[in-house]
């Protein structure tokens, strides 16, 4: 197991690379989509009408972008584990089944080939129309640390998606006379299937793993659009669409734990590890489930993170694990302090994985569950 750190575009700086090394990370998961303004990484409420930001001017990333990123990261003593998330502008019509779908699919194929050629082994993505939306921000974590959470009763989950917005970002100007977007579960799965059947063979040739993030929040629907992977067993359905090592998972532990009706996630994590399809892992902890949960410090939620490490150890997982987002601590560098706490906790668990003893969960719980 290897420790990584996720950095947003504006946070891909020498100072943050140095911080990552100091905290024990060896790998970087880079977000090239510019979600936020300003230079400081932070949490996002994800609930404003216009979402996180405007990506309408984004140009498709190419080999030079990726090669420059890989060189910069390596020059700073680290390795690239993955890039995370396509800009919504690159695939809005793939998600919405719009008129530029074929053109955008071809663009994604070029992007995947260029990433593989540059030495980027994995691309994380989230096949979602509403995206990460509905959070609130407040002193929800231990010691009143700032964190994010979901209270579905406090928002209107059916608030229509503004025209020109997908994945919680504006990809073009809106039309005032446009009809609200509505998408059923069957329609969304059909779109995902068409996407995977087109791009996974290209990823195989390029030596790239496409790693799917589950829904966050994992509600049944948001903003008139169905959610996709909002139960752990739906990951199996996704992997079965194209049975390939390049059709993998961006395994977010917090999102799995948030899913309603899921008593425990340990058997699911073991099953996914046994299938050998985990691209990388978001090591995040939470308390509660949809419709009401909040994110916690990594040692203070409903997930036994030591048990997760035992399972990964037993199943031979040797990939990258990152903290994902964390609560912010009360100091002059709240983001860095929160990340440092999570990275230190993770490093201690992983360095002592052999001494953690046997797994405490029934290995038979990894029996596969069919999703329909």
Give residue spans per PLM region.
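Short beta-strand and adjacent tight-turn residues that come in two discontinuous sequence segments
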Residues: 30, 125, 322
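A short beta-strand-loop structural module common to alpha/beta enzyme folds
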Residues: 26-36
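Structural motif corresponding to the early beta-alpha repeats
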Residues: 34-193, 205, 255, 313
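Residue-level "edge-of-site" marker
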Residues: 9, 33, 86, 128, ...
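Histidine-acidic metal/acid-base catalytic patches
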Residues: 2, 11, 16-19, 24, ...
């Amino acid at each position: 197991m290897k420790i990584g750190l996720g950095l947003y575009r504006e946070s891909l700086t020498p100072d943050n690379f140095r911080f990552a090394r100091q905290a024990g990370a060896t790998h970087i998961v880079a977000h090239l989509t510019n979600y936020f303004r300003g230079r400081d990484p932070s949490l996002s409420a994800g609930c404003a009408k216009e979402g996180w930001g405007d990506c309408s001017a984004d140009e498709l990333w190419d080999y030079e972008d990726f090669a420059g990123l890989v060189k910069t990261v390596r020059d700073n003593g680290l390795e690239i584990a993955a890039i995370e998330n396509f800009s919504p502008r690159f695939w809005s019509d793939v998600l919405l089944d719009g008129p530029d779908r074929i053109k955008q699919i071809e663009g994604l194929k070029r992007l995947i080939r260029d990433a593989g050629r540059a030495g980027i082994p994995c691309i994380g993505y989230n096949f979602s129309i509403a995206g990460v939306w509905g959070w609130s921000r407040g002193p929800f974590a231990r010691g009143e640390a700032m964190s994010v959470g979901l209270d579905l009763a406090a928002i209107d989950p059916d608030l229509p998606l503004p025209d020109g917005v997908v994945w919680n970002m504006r990809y073009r100007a809106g039309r005032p006379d446009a009809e609200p977007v509505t998408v059923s579960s069957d329609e969304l799965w059909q779109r995902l299937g068409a996407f995977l059947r087109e791009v996974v063979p290209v990823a195989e040739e390029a030596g790239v793993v496409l790693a799917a993030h589950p829904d966050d929040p994992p509600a049944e629907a948001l903003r008139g659009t169905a959610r996709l992977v909002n139960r752990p067993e739906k990951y199996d359905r996704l992997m079965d669409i194209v049975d390939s090592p390049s059709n993998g998972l961006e395994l977010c532990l917090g999102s799995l734990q948030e899913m309603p009706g899921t008593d425990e996630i340990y058997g699911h994590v073991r099953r996914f590890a046994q299938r050998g399809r985990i691209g990388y892992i978001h090591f995040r902890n939470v308390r509660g489930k949809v419709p009401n949960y909040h994110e916690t410090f990594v040692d203070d939620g409903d997930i036994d993170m030591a048990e997760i490490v035992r399972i990964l150890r037993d199943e031979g997982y040797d990939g990258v694990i990152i903290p994902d987002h964390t609560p912010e601590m009360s100091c002059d560098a709240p983001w860095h302090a929160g990340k440092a706490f999570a990275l230190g906790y993770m490093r201690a668990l992983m360095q002592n994985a052999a001494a953690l003893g046997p797994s405490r969960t029934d290995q038979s719980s990894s029996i596969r569950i069919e999703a329909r």
